[in-house]
Design a protein with these regions (language model features):
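Nucleotide-activated sugar donor-binding and catalytic core shared by glycosyltransferases
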Residues: 1-234
Length: 234
């Protein structure tokens, strides 16, 4: 999905002739967004957009030590300061620790009338909502993939996405209230929004699905299986 990931696979011993860089598959989803009106989207998802809006998705961390209740509390308590911002919050995934996130997510929505919990927006409505919103906060891969491709800012909190390729529209921070709030102010700033428009995502690609299909179709599976050798870097 990126040139850097292609390089890493070759470093692991794969022959360069067998490794292809095509871009991330989400490029196709973005290019296939159907025309929509803001009013219709609001009706479809049951959410009234404000002047400023953000999408929130927090998943459990699977690396970097214990994903503590304290971190979750800090995250949602900081977001509670955004009184005049429309917040669309989606469910965490099913990794261990998701129930604790859900507990605080529901509490967060109950105490703040600018928050709308949507279990799953679906691919099309998610991308449409992101096009309207100012950006994303949390630790979803969408903050590294879809958000930069749509020229939107994202705040990547914690270690879940550590080690993945990123770009200038992504603000990395840990579970620290002051740092998160500082990042939030930045993501809504005119200067940062303008900078995001100039960012080139490392995941960019065209006709990704078709390229993958053509590559797979051109390969002889039995030959690939028999000719597998370790490639030494020169």
């Amino acid at each position: 999905s990126t040139k850097n990931y292609k390089k890493r696979l070759i470093q692991l011993g794969e022959s360069p002739s067998r490794v292809y860089h095509v871009g991330a598959i989400c490029n196709d989803n973005i290019n296939n967004i159907k025309k929509f009106s803001k009013k219709r989207l609001e009706k479809d998802i049951g959410f009234k957009f404000k002047k400023r809006n953000i999408i929130v998705t927090l998943h459990p961390e699977t690396t970097g030590g214990q994903f503590t209740e304290k971190k979750i509390k800090i995250f949602f308590k900081t977001l509670s300061k955004l009184k005049n911002v429309g917040i669309i919050a989606t469910y965490p995934n099913i990794d261990a620790g998701n129930q604790l996130i859900l507990k605080y997510l529901e509490k967060f929505a109950k105490e703040n009338n600018n928050v709308k919990i949507i279990k799953s927006l679906g691919a099309q409505n998610y991308l449409k909502s992101l096009k309207i919103c100012d950006g994303i906060i949390g630790n979803s891969s969408s903050g590294l993939l879809e958000s930069p491709l749509l020229k939107k800012g994202s705040i990547n909190v914690g270690l879940r996405q550590k080690g993945r390729d990123t770009c200038g529209s992504v603000i990395d921070t840990d579970f620290d209230s002051k740092k998160i709030y500082k990042a939030l102010k930045k993501i809504f700033s005119k200067k940062f929004k303008n900078n995001c428009k100039k960012v080139k995502s490392p995941y960019i690609g065209k006709n990704v699905s078709h390229k993958i299909y053509k590559i797979i179709k051109s390969q002889k599976v039995q030959k690939l299986r028999n000719d597998k050798v370790f490639y030494d870097l020169r």
